[in-house]
Swiss-Prot record:
The keyword rRNA processing does not apply. Pfam families: RNA_pol_Rpb2_1 (PF04563), RNA_pol_Rpb2_2 (PF04561), RNA_pol_Rpb2_3 (PF04565), RNA_pol_Rpb2_45 (PF10385), RNA_pol_Rpb2_6 (PF00562), RNA_pol_Rpb2_7 (PF04560). The keyword Cytoplasm does not apply. This is DNA-directed RNA polymerase subunit beta. Its EC number is 2.7.7.6. The gene is rpoB. It comes from Streptococcus pyogenes serotype M1. One of its GO terms (biological process) is DNA-templated transcription. GO terms for cellular component: DNA-directed RNA polymerase complex.
């Protein structure tokens, strides 16, 4: 027997064909959401408060300080928040201290700071009753970047940019004349020496001394206009920068100085963030820049005088490691003191080394480092600017390397916590201005923190973010896999990110650093391709927001692959060589072969085993969760694998789902972490279990109660239904499944079914990927799903009186009211179809001016129907089904309703949708198709043992698409069915063809895995043997019921009077200009005329035509289309004298709609009234006939 048994949870065993032993379990798959939010609660929120506070007033006599904060209990539980359309949020109370610096008085007070949405255990937020997800954003990391560009003459120039988290950009660039310029905040460029002089180094020799001799420096000094040799050059340089930043304003040295300080050196205005400081220090650090260079001077320990490294030595990694503590200490440190006019007058500490030029061995190049400022320094320092300039000048000398912006070492993730912190910071900054004004205006003695703090800007910023940000998305709840994928999504769009139109190919492309960090397969097709990605299965964020992936460490001394796990970011991985997970190992953990396949900086090649530093932990670390659920992924073309991964997320939860016979072993983990199942929080024993709740007694005697959700409407209108798995007496361990969620079976993801599939054509019905299906799948509800739709009706106060919900509806027969209760609300369990009343509601209507006689009659007989009109909630088109639930909210019951609403009724209707012709189906390999014919079971082809085939697919769909995985799945699935087992074939480590054939033979199938099929209609065998097997097929959310649409009479657009478009508006089909050309080409003038008039926007014409048809008279001639009148009016509005003349040059009157001259034209608001009148006349006729 090939393969080995593996248990997944307590309910499933699979035969796995994996060969590589897993050394690391998958992390919790939604930790990117939950961990980030927890960090925000623990430290992120505190940091934001500490960034903005303390706040002083303008005279610096009062100061508001932050003390601490506390979250109280949420107002609603999760379930209540869903029912009441409320947000699941907790009140936050912040303690402030107000210090009066003149009197020393301190007032401490706790201030309510609004309700803050709280993340659920599933990684989602409930906002206004709907479940939402904050998608993590992939952005360019703050830091310093260097680039090169080739001009039209083929000359290479260099550029550099310092990008902060917030603040002004600082750029450097060279031009064709070899002069270096700087730009501050995207303004006009100035020679870079001007900025150096502004920093307090005004002499030409001083500048050369710092950066060393180079053509770029000399040319720029020549170009620099500040020639007078004194410290006043600094003043002039400052003024020139001021003029660039604030053109037209009067410039003084002091204002120039304070402006530059504010732009770069003030931590409140300029913030690199922790990650920016880390990236700047890493890039400008002297150690990485000296690597593999030849040193041009002796390196001497200043304290002992000992020569550490002699001139001419190559600075290999081992040499640098040997003097590392000296490099981190005071080796070659120079302290420069700026002149008194400088922006920052503190001494500037730099590290300077001289190395041999890689281009010209006779020249010496100076490398200047920023001497590693502390991580706490979040603003730029003069040392950073000088070190950046040095790196930039070194690039022209062949030292250093330019950055690749698409490298994942330069792109980071902003997860929920950080996005929320940024939003909170915006709110606090708005509040700060407010507070400062109030502190200055009001009397200091009576001020309390409560009085000066207005929390509205903060709550508004948070609300706006959750409600309308591009990154706050309605959760994709088609099935558990789509929930999980949505929580792990990484978007490069959104505020501060890219836009679809500006993103080129490079940003969207797969990059070698995506390996193990971002899935190269799962991304949408269409305009967002490559901009929206998914985290790989083992991906994990470090404290700076860079994605790490785990590797097994290789002990270089012994050559052993250890089980020690090291997590590396993309730029750390660039320094090492990594072997693949399938490298063959001996028993003792050493490599079995001298040469192994590996990767180094994007090169995939063979390496000697002795140079390998790390080994992949698992073959599936490359791909995301949805992709890891595709068996035989390694045999599919990547374009089709992309479709397969995406379509699994569109699977509709079925009534009785089945886990796949051929899985990948990922199904259990995906279901477990998706948040859709009920998972045990602690060990214990089940003491009660039914469909709605499970009670578990812990070992310490306490009782846990788990509520099971039954048929709740999901975000996408499917039934969210959980099924209990445990029974009384079961022993449960922490992490076990208590109940399956939707699309799960026995604790495994189960998106579809395992039908018997044959690859064969049949009467041409599976042309172009169409799917032929057996009636068995319809009759036995194999592909039946339940869909829930929610309808609501509310009563409001109107000017003419309140609306009311009632059974007494004017002009409605008793038949229509049979399922309404005494209030006029539909009963639960009623079967309803289109047009049925769900909630009876009447609205008062304005009285027309009645004569005295009419008023008298009205008063005597009290004719109710005159005063109110019927505004009942009715079942819309396509909403037929069974009433599943009714919820009533009223003010009297203490429900919170919008202002002006007195009562709200919600009705939930369940539909059972069987599979039908026109529904879309798919396999897991991107093989999708539409059901074209449902054939009676007796007519389907059958196997020699009499089993009829369930589905027939077109074999032509395989070769050109190159997704051969489906054929392998087919054969292995048949073997699994015959053997009565389930199989796991993990991606890139699954069943080989030998395993496949061994299993096929074991199952007693023929050696070619094909079979003879018999025609169900004739009983004759087909000519050729056919591939028949079991393939996992899913029903997708694109159902024909949601798409089929037809219109007879419906609404019209107000301006053009043309029919609306789209199914939702009950619209018509657009007859566009190309269709008009087609009819013109045929010369079908009468057809064309009626399409452009009666059927479109000839208002009077269509009313006359309707009347003529209903009365059986000939249809009158059409009039002028309304859109022509609109065109004439638009031209007249431009002041053009536009008239319409007939063939005798007489002006044709274009009548306005409201000037009804002709009495025999019906002026009807809508055709409904005409219909009612017609129906009434017909009824009267039939009544008189009955009487006769």
């Amino acid at each position: 027997m090939a393969g080995h048994e593996v248990r997944y949870g307590k309910h499933r065993t699979r035969r796995s064909f994996s060969r590589i032993k897993e050394v690391l379990d998958l992390p919790n798959l939604i930790e990117i959401q939950t961990d980030s939010f927890q960090d925000f609660l623990d430290s992120g929120l505190k940091e934001v408060f500490e960034d903005v506070l303390p706040i002083s007033n303008f005279t610096d006599t009062m100061e508001l300080e932050f003390v601490g904060y506390e979250f109280k209990e949420p107002k609603y539980t999760l379930e209540e928040a869903r029912i009441h359309d409320a947000s699941y949020s907790a009140p936050i109370f912040v303690t402030f201290r107000l210090v009066n610096k003149e009197t020393g008085e301190i007032k401490t007070q706790e201030v309510f700071f609004g309700d803050f949405p709280i993340m659920t255990e599933m990684g989602t937020f409930i906002i206004n009753g709907g479940e939402r997800i904050i998608v993590s954003q992939l952005v360019r990391s703050p830091g310093v970047y260097f680039n090169d560009k080739v001009d039209k003459n083929g000359k290479v120039g260099y550029g550099s940019t310092v990008i902060p988290n917030r603040g002004a950009w600082l750029e450097l660039e060279t031009d064709s004349k070899d002069i270096a310029y700087t730009r501050i905040d995207r303004t006009r460029k100035i020679p870079f020496t001007t900025l150096v002089r502004a920093l307090g180094f005004s002499g030409d020799d001083e500048i050369v001394d710092i950066f060393g001799e180079s053509d770029l420096v000399r040319n720029t000094i020549e170009k620099d206009i500040h020639k007078n040799p004194s410290d006043s050059r600094t003043d002039e340089a400052l003024k020139e920068i001021y003029e660039r930043l604030r053109p037209g304003e009067p410039k003084t040295a002091d204002s120039s100085r304070s402006l530059l300080i504010a732009r770069f050196f003030d931590a409140r205005r300029y913030d690199l963030a922790a990650v920016g400081r880390y990236k700047v220090n890493k890039k400008l650090n002297i150690k990485t820049r000296l690597l593999n260079q030849i040193i041009a001077e002796n390196l001497v320990d200043a304290e002992t005088g000992e020569i550490l490294v002699e001139a001419g030595t190559e600075m290999t990694r081992s040499v640098i490691e040997s003097i590392e503590e000296h490099l981190d200490g005071d080796l070659n440190k120079f302290v420069y003191t700026p002149n008194d006019y400088a922006v920052v007058t503190e001494p500037v500490v730099l590290q300077k080394f001289k190395v041999v030029s890689p281009i010209d061995p006779d020249r010496v190049v100076t490398i200047v480092g920023n001497a590693n400022p502390d991580d706490k320094v979040r603003a730029l320092t003069p040392a950073d600017i000088l070190a950046e300039m040095s790196y930039f000048l070194n690039l022209a000398e062949g030292l250093g390397k330019v950055d690749d912006i698409d490298h994942l070492g330069n792109r980071r993730i902003r997860a929920v916590g950080e996005l929320l912190a940024n939003q909170f910071r915006i709110g606090l900054a708005r509040m700060e201005r407010n507070v400062r004004e109030r502190m200055s205006v009001q009397d200091n003695d009576v001020l309390t923190p409560q009085q000066i703090i207005n929390i509205r800007p903060v709550t508004a910023a948070v609300k706006e973010f959750f409600g309308s940000s591009q990154l706050s998305q309605f959760m994709d709840q088609h099935n558990p896999l789509s929930e999980l994928s949505h929580k792990r999504r990484l978007s490069a769009l959104g505020p501060g990110g890219l836009t679809r139109d500006r993103a080129g190919y490079e940003v969207r492309d797969v990059h070698y650093t995506h390996y193990g960090r971002m899935c190269p397969i799962e991304t949408p097709e269409g305009p967002n391709i490559g901009l929206i990605n998914n985290l790989s299965s083992f991906g994990h964020l470090n404290k700076y927001g860079f994605i790490q992936t785990p590797y097994r460490k290789v002990d270089r001394a012994t050559g052993t692959v250890t089980n020690e796990i090291v997590w590396l970011t993309a730029d750390e991985e660039d320094e090492y060589t990594v072997a693949q997970a399938n490298s063959k190992l001996n028993e003792d953990g050493t490599f079995a072969e001298e040469i192994v396949m590996g990767r180094h900086q994007g090169n995939n090649q063979e390496f000697s085993a002795s140079v390998v530093d790390f080994v992949d932990v698992s073959p599936k670390q490359v791909v995301a969760v949805a992709t890891a659920c595709i068996p035989f992924l390694e045999n599919d073309d990547s374009n089709r694998a992309l479709m397969g991964a995406n379509m699994q997320r569109q699977a509709v939860p079925l009534i009785d789902p089945k886990a796949p016979y051929v899985g990948t072993g990922m199904e259990y983990q995906a279901a477990h972490d998706s948040g859709a199942a009920v998972i045990a929080q602690q060990n214990g024993k089940v003491v009660f279990s039914d469909a709605e709740k499970v009670e578990i007694r812990r070992q310490d005697g306490s009782l846990d109660v788990y509520h099971i959700t039954k048929f709740r409407r999901s975000n996408s209108g499917t039934a969210y239904n959980q099924r209990t798995l445990v029974k009384v007496g079961d022993i449960v361990e922490k992490g076990d499944f208590i109940a399956d969620g939707p699309s799960m079976e026995n604790g495994e993801m189960a998106l579809g079914q395992n039908p018997v599939v044959a690859y064969m054509t049949w009467e041409g019905y599976n042309f172009e990927d169409a799917v032929i299906m057996s009636e068995r799948l319809v009759k036995e509800d194999v592909y039946t799903s339940v869909h829930l739709e929610e309808f609501e009706s509310e009563t409001r106060d109107t000017k003419l009186g309140p609306e009311e919900i009632t059974r007494e509806i004017p002009n409605v027969g008793e038949e229509a009211l049979k399922d309404l209760d005494e209030m006029g609300i539909i009963r639960i369990g009623a079967e309803v179809k289109e047009g049925d009343i769900l909630v009876g509601k009447v609205t008062p209507k304005g009285e027309k001016d009645l004569s005295a006689e009419e008023r008298l009659l009205h008063a005597i007989f009290g004719d109710k129907s005159r005063e109110v009109r019927d505004t009942s909630l009715r079942v819309p088109h396509g909403g037929d089904g069974i009433v599943r639930d009714v919820k009533i909210f009223t003010r009297a019951n203490g429900d919170e309703l919008q202002s002006g609403v007195n009562m709200l009724v919600r009705v939930y209707i369940a539909q059972k949708r069987k599979i039908k012709v026109g529904d879309k189906m798919a396999g897991r390999h991107g093989n999708k198709g539409v059901v074209s014919r449902i054939v009676p079971v007796e007519d389907m082809p059958y196997l020699p043992d009499g089993t009829p085939v369930d589905i027939m697919l077109n074999p032509l769909g395989v070769p050109s698409r190159m997704n051969i995985g489906q054929v392998m799945e087919l054969h292995l699935g048949m073997a699994a069915r015959n053997l009565g087992i389930h199989i796991a074939t993990p991606v890139f480590d699954g069943a080989s063809s030998e395993d496949l054939w061994d299993t096929v033979r074991e199952a007693g199938m023929d050696s070619d895995a094909k079979t003879v099929l018999y025609d169900g209609r004739t009983g004759e065998p087909f000519d050729n043997r056919v591939s028949v097997g079991v393939m996992y097929m899913i029903k997708l959310h694109h159902m024909v019921d949601d798409k089929l649409h037809a219109r007879s009479v419906g609404p019209y657009s107000l301006v053009t009077q043309q029919p609306l478009g789209g199914k939702a508006q009950f619209g018509g089909q657009r007859f566009g200009e190309m269709e008009v050309w087609a009819l013109e080409a045929y010369g079908a003038s009468n057809v064309l005329q009626e399409i452009l008039t009666y059927k479109s926007d000839d208002v009077t014409g269509r009313l006359k035509a309707y009347e003529a048809i209903t009365k059986g008279k000939p249809i009158p001639k059409p009039g002028v289309p309304e859109s022509f009148r609109v065109l004439v009016k638009e031209l007249q509005s431009l002041g053009l004298d536009m008239r319409v003349l007939d063939e005798d040059d007489n002006e044709v009157e274009l009548r306005d709609l409201d000037e009804g001259e002709d009495d025999d034209i019906m002026h009807v608001d809508d055709l409904e009234k005409a219909r009612e009148k017609q129906a009434q006349e017909t009824q009267e006729v039939s009544e008189t006939t009955d009487e006769k």
